[in-house]
Structure formats: structure tokens, C-alpha cells
Amino acid sequence: MDDPKSEQQRILRRHQRERQELQAQIRSLKNSVPKTDKTKRKQLLQDVARMEAEMAQKHRQELEKFQDDSSIESVVEDLAKMNLENRPPRSSKAHRKRERMESEERERQESIFQAEMSEHLAGFKREEEEKLAAILGARGLEMKAIPADGHCMYRAIQDQLVFSVSVEMLRCRTASYMKKHVDEFLPFFSNPETSDSFGYDDFMIYCDNIVRTTAWGGQLELRALSHVLKTPIEVIQADSPTLIIGEEYVKKPIILVYLRYAYSLGEHYNSVTPLEAGAAGGVLPRLL
């Protein structure tokens, strides 16, 4: 078995290759969509932002699993070494000049596209926030910001509980419930790279990572938390109907806000708070 440093180098090389492949895919997509087609251009920008966010999150989570005692300097040295290893053989002056010009043109086009994407994403963010403010306002609520640290879903849940419980405990209870109810959750999991269904061992590793890492939580984790708290959970979205999880429970629901464009790393959960003090209450959840 490889030592941790060798394993880290292998992961970094793969991440570099995957980023290059993604950028090539993005360039191909850009060339396939006319700049005059605003509808398709908007969808392209959404798809690009999603793909980049998913890859960034995937790479971050993979590196968390293989962190060792190496300093940041050693990682930089590894990256520099990889660049040297991947450097092409010397070529003619004319060939190098042509390559440099082509590289500069690609960088210029990429810069234009990134600026365009940033502008559009800022517009998507404003539009999303306005829609959510209207939906929440109709219910006498407003959004409450939660840090984007990988724990956002659990922190948003924690924010609405009347008892003291740590994010770590919520993660532990989520993973424990999922492990005890494998048949309820396992069919919905697959490998994001191969699309192969998870086996039992894969699922157990996934549950362990809920506890050990800052892995982002989603709908299945919310389902588990709904059972743990014996409480319905509502997820308000700008462009989709409100998702209700745990409808079989009768307590006052926990309400989360799901955002697609709030942060560059992708999806995010926020909490809510009443617009006015003294809002009507209900039977509040407790950790069982």
C-alpha cells in the first residue's frame, strides 16, 4: 500500500488532470452556444458554475480524507515537481511563439467568459434572493445567514432548535440513523464517477464521512434528521415548490432556505427568522 505522501501526490495529479479535462469540456460547450442565444447562454453559465462547484467540493472532500502532517510548502513542491514532469520537450522558436500566442488567446477568451459568467451569476444571485424574500415575506419570515463552511445544513437546523446541541452531535445522530436503516437509504446512493450503485461497505464509509469530514448534507441527510427529531423539515427554494420532509410528524416544522447561487462553491442552506418578534409558535422538536 502507498505511503500517505505518495497517495497525496497521486490525488493531486488526478485532480490536475480532472481540472484540465473540465476546462476542455467547458471550452467545447462555450463554442457550441451562440452568444446571441441568451436563453442557452444563461443555461450554459448555470451548468458551468455547477460543474466547477461540484468538482471543487469533490476535490476538497477527497483531500480531507488523505491529509497528513505534510506542510503547505511540501504540497507546493509537489505541484511544482508535477509541472516539471509535465513540461513538453524543447521545440523550435517559431513553434514556441505560436504556442505562446495560442495560449494567450485561450487565456483572453477564458477571461472574457469568466467575466461574463461572474456578471450573470451576480444577476442570478440577486434574482434568487428577491424571489426568496417574497416567498418568506408572505409567511412572515426572513432569511438568516449561516456560514458556508460545509456544515451549513446542520447549522441551519441547529439554529432553530430550542435546546443546545452541537453540529457534531447532529452529524453523529444523522449517520447513526442512516446506518441503522440501511434499506431506507442505500438504494439512493451511487458513485458520482462511475454511476455504479453503492455497496454496503461504500454506504458505511459515506456515513462515517458525515461524522469525520465537512461533507455537505442533502435531502437524504435531512430525511434522517427529520426522523431523529420527529419533526417535519421544509426546504424553501426560489424556483421550485417547497420540499417537505417528514410530513408524518405534527410538530412545528424546521424551515430551511436552499440557495443555488449564494456562493461560488455552489449550493448553500440558510436558516429563517420571524420578521416580527412574537410570531406564533408550536410544539418544538427535541432530540430523541
Curated annotation (Swiss-Prot):
Biased composition of type Basic and acidic residues is found at 1-10, 99-110
Q: Which InterPro entries match?
A: OTU_dom, OTU_OTUD6, Papain-like_cys_pep_sf, Peptidase_C85-like
Q: Does the keyword Hydrolase apply?
A: yes
An example Pfam family from this entry, by short name, is OTU
Top-level EC class as recorded in UniProt: hydrolase
Q: What residues sit in the active site?
A: 149, 152, 268
Q: Which GO terms describe its biological process?
A: protein K11-linked deubiquitination; protein K27-linked deubiquitination; protein K29-linked deubiquitination; protein K33-linked deubiquitination; proteolysis
Give me the ranges of the annotated region His-loop: 258-268
Q: Which domain of life is it from?
A: Eukaryota
Keywords in alphabetical order, please.
Answer: Hydrolase, Protease, Thiol protease, Ubl conjugation pathway
Give a short account of what the protein does. Answer: Deubiquitinating enzyme that hydrolyzes 'Lys-27'-, 'Lys-29'- and 'Lys-33'-linked polyubiquitin chains. Also able to hydrolyze 'Lys-11'-linked ubiquitin chains.
Annotated PANTHER family: OTU DOMAIN CONTAINING PROTEIN, OTU DOMAIN-CONTAINING PROTEIN 6A
Q: What is this protein called?
A: OTU domain-containing protein 6A
What species was this sequence derived from? Answer: Homo sapiens
* Gene name for this UniProt entry: OTUD6A
